[in-house]
Amino acid sequence: MLLLGFYRSGSWILDPNGAPILTDFTPMWLAGREALAGHAAAAYDSRHFGEIQTEFVGPHAGQYPWPYPPIFFLPAAVVALLPYAWAFLAWQAATLAGCLAAGYRILRDGLTPLAILAAPLSLLNAYVGQNGFLTAALIGAGLSFLERWPIIAGICFGCLFYKSQFLLLFPLLFAIAGHWRALAATVAVGALLAIASSLAFGVEPWVAFPPALTERAQAALVVQDLAWGKLQSVYGLARALGLGALPAGIVHAILALLVAALACLIWRRRGSFDVKAAAAASAALIVTPYLFAYDMAAIVIPGAFLVKDLIERGGTRREHAAIFGLFCGLFAMFAGAGIVPLGAIVNLLLFSLIARRAFRGPAPSPAV
């Protein structure tokens, strides 16, 4: 209803005159149009792509880059077949459906979709037209299929190559736990997607992508072409607190390595798979320095696995209170989006709760 109100007021997708509004979805749709026109590599030319955006949304709207690998031209080209507004709605509806399905598969509770919809970062992702729902769907589905259907899990994680910063930890965890079929499927699907994108759009995008990615990383992580409050990683928090690029990078690297090491230890131990899945999904959001508010929509996945374990094995009142507090923290993060990167703190607190449960085991609540 809130999004409908934004749309009717001319502040979402289209302005009051029916012209497109610049959102994070705009570069995806325009990149898809470039790919359909036969020159996908042009999307990595920041000057050319900026001119296209200016022509599409006007000179005063600003510009967004196209930082995704060439495999992401595949879905971009599909949505670009639709008119802009319909493409926006179709993309959000399809990826949200995947996210809701993944959440339901984890908890098997009819209230799960409602909880995901109630999460404030779901509204943020839908408003800006981003791909946080897709990231959540792939991680959630991949982990939920891992034990019984490892090939399907590998397919999900192979598709996550579109945002490889969230994939970094999973192959290592799969190797540690002996999920070799899932690991092989992940690599195979990634390779097949690369081949498919090359056949569809040529090899030129693969040549243009590395320098474009370097340029974007330099702009986002060093030059600061955006407010540090939008970067929800430990690195973003350190920069927001006044640290320079090098010391912030060191702080992030130390915490990322610590979290990765703990996740590996959790996956080496015998114990609840739900706790292991929660640890992996949570750690994936912490180890990358490149994490924006809309990416935090994926926090529902570690939360769902943790809640499932609390339901099945019991938990203390403190654990239940902590979960509720973290959920409230997401609202605080939503209110402070772009000002203070509270997402880093929420992620670290959630992982701490998961790790505590992994190493100490469940402690049932006292009987009432």
Regions found by a protein language model. Name each.
Residues M1-I152, F174-V300, A304-I311, S365-V368:
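Primarily membrane-embedded glycan-assembly and transfer machineries that use lipid-linked glycans
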Residues Y127, L160, G249, L353-I354:
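Short alpha-helical segments used as structural interaction elements across diverse proteins
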Residues I151-S164, L168-A175, A280-V287, F327-F331:
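Membrane-interface alpha helices of multi-pass inner-membrane proteins
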Residues C156, A245, L349-L350:
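Helix-centric, low-specificity signal for extended rod-like, repetitive segments
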Residues Y162-Q165, L192-S197, E319-A322:
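Membrane-embedded alpha-helical segments of transport systems
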Residues K308-V368:
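Aromatic-enriched
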